[in-house]
Amino acid sequence: MKKVELVFIPSPGAGHHLPTLQFVKRLIDRNDRISITILAIQSYFPTTLSSYTKSIAASEPRIRFIDVPQPQDRPPQEMYKSRAQIFSLYIESHVPSVKKIITNLVSSSANSSDSIRVAALVVDLFCVSMIDVAKELNIPSYLFLTSNAGYLAFMLHLPILHEKNQIAVEESDPDWSIPGIVHPVPPRVLPAALTDGRLSAYIKLASRFRETRGIIVNTFVELETHAITLFSNDDRVPPVYPVGPVIDLDDGQEHSNLDQAQRDKIIKWLDDQPQKSVVFLCFGSMGSFGAEQVKEIAVGLEQSGQRFLWSLRMPSPKGIVPSDCSNLEEVLPDGFLERTNGKKGLICGWAPQVEILAHSATGGFLSHCGWNSILESLWHGVPIATWPMYAEQQLNAFRMVRELGMALEMRLDYKAGSADVVGADEIEKAVVGVMEKDSEVRKKVEEMGKMARKAVKDGGSSFASVGRFIEDVIGQN
């Protein structure tokens, strides 16, 4: 039987790369006819993924990485209006190089005695411009959405509203009714790029979704039944494959750059804490706060009386990933470290998030509501208090609280970079609430965690969905 090669083009950045790597590993585990080529576009922003991808390539002979050459003339960041536009236009500049690489792959497979065919191009949200390459080479294209079905519903609806000139994004405007999302969505929880008037990049991306042969989504039927059922009954939407949770359960332990001593210190401290007694604060690879907000968080934690593990990152120059704090005493209230650090709490920089969420001492999570973090918290049965910051995180937080009842509302509409400072009392209330032992939110999260584990096992909904995707790809070859 013919072997098939799938070419993946993920967006740069951990939130896109890591789910892609986990998904392709799942594909090759399921079918020995499949091999994977990942076209690696260097990030516009500094990242720490290269060592991890190299370790994957070394350990998985059917996964290879090809670096896409950088364009000679890279427009300066100041030319772009939004992060979405930076990503999409920067990636568009790689189209000629990607076309050349895939053309060579197709040509070499046609001339090879190994009988391996390039069967599909799988692109990320910000890489939909590569669909044109697939069309030119007569290769089916699929979208791999590392976010959720609700976000897919939003993106599919966006071009429709644009055509009707019905996009209203001022906070005073009426709520949006979006097919696939149960409750009307207030404009204040829409992605910041929309409410700031930077709409064109999102519409350009969203308008390409329906051109694909199928859409793979990092979710599972039991979590987002409403949206997935709607997609399956809509002939205008390509087949949707809910394959999640696709999460890095190894927590990137293969990263050579991760500080093993830091990890050991964190886990040893957690080992000494009572079961479900620690609230974990972590805000993603791009999440950080200024000094005033850091002090309010510290006061709120101390007032709450709860044990805490706080991944504290400080802002860096625009476009640079936040860094660990070099001098905690400068940004924390006087005496805070002496009163809490190592006793009631532990402050760190980088933290092994999945390992922390899996630890029996962890009882709650104050999170930015990135989709990977939400899936990891559900998997391990740890409830979230919402503190969204950027991208679609406000919409994620809104749906987790209002639609699914699986998160505690602290803020739904906070946006990174705003002058808004969340006060200590509000933080205290959220921390105490998310740590409540017998709350309805905790019960729902723990039950959904069990469903998530069933979904990816043989006989589960996501296991079946991965099988359907493989059949669709192989069936054409």
From Swiss-Prot:
GO MF annotation, one: UDP-glucosyltransferase activity
Keyword entries, A-Z: Glycosyltransferase, Transferase
Enzyme Commission code: 2.4.1.-
Temperature dependence: Optimum temperature is 40 degrees Celsius.
InterPro entries the record matches: UDP-glycosyltransf_plant, UDP_glucos_trans, UDP_glycos_trans_CS
SUPFAM superfamilies: UDP-Glycosyltransferase/glycogen phosphorylase
Enzyme class, first EC level, given as a word: transferase
Chain sites annotated for binding UDP-alpha-D-glucose: 285, 350-351, 368-376, 390-393
Keyword Glycosyltransferase tagged: yes
pH-dependence annotation: Optimum pH is 6.75.
PANTHER family the record matches: GLYCOSYLTRANSFERASE
Functional description taken from the UniProt entry: Glycosyltransferase that possesses chalcone and flavonol 2'-O-glycosyltransferase activity. Converts phloretin to phlorizin (phloretin 2'-O-glucoside), a potent antioxidant. Possesses glycosyltransferase activity toward quercetin, isoliquiritigenin, butein and caffeic acid.
Similarity comment: family membership: Belongs to the UDP-glycosyltransferase family.
Protein name (record): UDP-glycosyltransferase 71K1
Classification lineage: Eukaryota, Viridiplantae, Streptophyta, Embryophyta, Tracheophyta
